[in-house]
Every structure is written in C-alpha cells, then in structure tokens.
Amino acid sequence: MPVRLTILGSGSSGNCAYLETDETRLLIDAGFSLRQIRQRLASIGRAPENLTGILVTHEHSDHVQSLPALSEKLRIPVYCNRPTQEAVEYQFQTRLVCRLFETGASFE
C-alpha cells in the first residue's frame, strides 16, 4: 500500500502534515489558519473537504489553531487523546466530537 506524507509546515508559527493512503486522507495537526491549510493542501492538489480525519498530536496552539473550524464547519472527525480534547475544548470554549485513543496504543 503506497503512503504519501507531506509536511505542510513546521515551526513555531504552525505545524501541519498530510498523510494519504488508498483509503485515508489524514491531516496531522491543524496549526495554521483554515485559509492557510486550504492553500497548503491546494499546493499538493488536495482540499480539506476530502479529509477523512484530523489527528491531533497535542494541544499547543501551533498544532490546533484551526481545529474547531475544520472539525465543525467541515464535519471532519478528530482523533486525539482525552487530555488533548479537554485542553482544546477549554482553549477554544467549544465542544469537540473526538474519536479518542489511549497514548501509546495502536488504533485504526
């Protein structure tokens, strides 16, 4: 199964990567504005509307800046652990629908 991994940006101003397989189109972190994520995905011929999920590594703002906009407006599932969910909900004063995983455990 071919895997495509593209780093869309990494640094103190934001972190975001795109992972694609035959069945999955995953954004890893959402540390840029929704507009910037759209532009960065467009530069590789992709769009946020086609994402199958967003994997959040942790709750720092340079990893979650547009997470509420992506998940709520575009109805994209969010994958994270419970502490990250709670921190993001507190930070943005919103409720996220997350598919939770345990840190260190495998999941599909």
What is the predicted function of each stretch?
Residues 22, 71-73, 92-93:
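Short glycine-enriched loop/turn motifs at secondary-structure junctions
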